[in-house]
């Protein structure tokens, strides 16, 4: 039913006043705004496809959690590296004071251009984070980790003092302030989190994340990363197989899973991703122990096929392009990086991915 001329005139006056008072774009019709999801690649093709939009969404809060040594920091460093490759700016807030520039460089991070902060308190870390977000010049901010955001009162107090709920209140207040700014600045704000065990749980999952419940609600994407098995070459352990479950996803269907190799001192194995996803999507063919691209042999055994692609990066690039082009929603999912990137990309894929939904 059409709106009456009087109501239309009153509505136009109200919208004009809101735009003058709060800035253009403070309110708009849904038809005026292109539904778009800008994404930053994760460094893992399998995870990009599982996320449904080609990577982690910009302008959103993301939580990555898991047990110790499961690959949380490695994954974020690959996201930082992908951001830098595409001309973006990244910041790493190292609340744990454990940042390793050598390993970050091995993961592809340009450490000379990376902004790194090692704050003394949780309040300082989140204030730095807010300043960076509001600048509009940062594409990705990683906070490592929520568990290390110690409130000032706890640091200044004595050992054994009780500070119940301080960290949860700190996170709740910070996320209330940050969520709107993150959306407007198109910054991807990534929180790494640790697991704790709930005491006395008889039924259900006893695991929980630190920092209260606020982050669970504000996060648009939550990724649960776990080590599945060790990768061995002979008797030597050379890496670990990681499985990531998309526990929450507001931009695409959730509960998809992705697996990839994390090689020690190298990070995520791009070639392993290409082999695995290529076979799943039938771009590569496996016959017995041999892997083929068309009629061309890549190698006997997965490790040999990975090594062949590592020795032939141009071929690996070509296969990756074929995978992304053949993935569900490929013509619509658009990857955009750069603080000055236009706020427009095609809609997120809402179809079924190659990874089974649970």
Swiss-Prot record:
Keywords: ATP-binding, Cytoplasm, DNA damage, DNA recombination, DNA repair, DNA-binding, Nucleotide-binding, SOS response. GO terms for cellular component: cytosol. One of its GO terms (molecular function) is damaged DNA binding. Pfam families: RecA, RecA_C. It is found in: Cytoplasm. One of its GO terms (biological process) is SOS response. ATP binds at residues 66-73. SMART domains: AAA. The keyword Zinc does not apply. Can catalyze the hydrolysis of ATP in the presence of single-stranded DNA, the ATP-dependent uptake of single-stranded DNA by duplex DNA, and the ATP-dependent hybridization of homologous single-stranded DNAs. It interacts with LexA causing its activation and leading to its autocatalytic cleavage. HAMAP family: RecA. Belongs to the RecA family. This is Protein RecA. It comes from Herpetosiphon aurantiacus (strain ATCC 23779 / DSM 785 / 114-95). The gene is recA.
């Amino acid at each position: 039913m059409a709106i009456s001329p009087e109501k239309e005139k009153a509505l136009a006056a109200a919208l004009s006043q809101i735009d003058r008072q709060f800035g253009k774009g403070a309110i708009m019709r849904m038809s005026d705004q292109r539904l778009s999801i800008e994404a930053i690649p994760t460094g893992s093709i399998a995870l990009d496809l599982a996320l449904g939009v080609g990577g982690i969404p910009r302008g959103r809060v993301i939580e990555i959690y898991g047990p110790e040594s499961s690959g949380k920091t490695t994954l974020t460093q690959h996201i930082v590296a992908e951001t830098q490759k595409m001309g973006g700016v990244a910041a790493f807030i190292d609340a744990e004071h454990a940042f390793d520039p050598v390993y970050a460089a091995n993961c592809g991070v340009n450490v000379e251009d990376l902004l790194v902060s090692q704050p003394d308190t949780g309040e300082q870390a989140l204030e730095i984070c807010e300043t960076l977000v509001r600048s509009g010049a940062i594409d990705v901010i990683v906070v490592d980790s929520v568990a290390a955001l110690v409130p000032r009162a706890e640091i200044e107090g004595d050992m054994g003092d009780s500070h119940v709920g301080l960290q949860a209140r700190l996170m709740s207040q910070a996320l209330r302030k940050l969520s709107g700014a993150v959306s407007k600045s198109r910054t991807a704000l990534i929180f790494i989190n640790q697991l704790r065990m709930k005491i006395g749980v008889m039924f259900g999952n006893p695991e929980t994340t630190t920092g209260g419940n606020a982050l669970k609600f504000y996060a648009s994407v939550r990724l649960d990363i776990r080590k599945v098995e060790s990768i061995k070459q002979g008797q030597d352990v050379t890496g670990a197989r990681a499985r990531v479950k998309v526990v929450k996803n507001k931009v695409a269907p959730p509960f998809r899973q992705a697996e990839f190799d994390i090689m020690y001192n190298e990070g995520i194995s791009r070639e392993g991703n290409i082999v695995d996803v290529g076979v799943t999507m039938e771009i590569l063919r496996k016959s017995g122990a041999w892997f083929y691209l068309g009629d061309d042999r890549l190698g006997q055994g997965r490790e040999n096929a990975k090594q062949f692609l590592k020795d032939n990066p141009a071929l690996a690039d070509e296969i990756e392009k074929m995978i992304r082009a053949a993935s569900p929603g490929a013509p619509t999912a658009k990857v955009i990086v750069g603080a000055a990137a236009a706020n427009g990309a095609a809609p997120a894929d809402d179809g079924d991915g190659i990874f089974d939904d649970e």
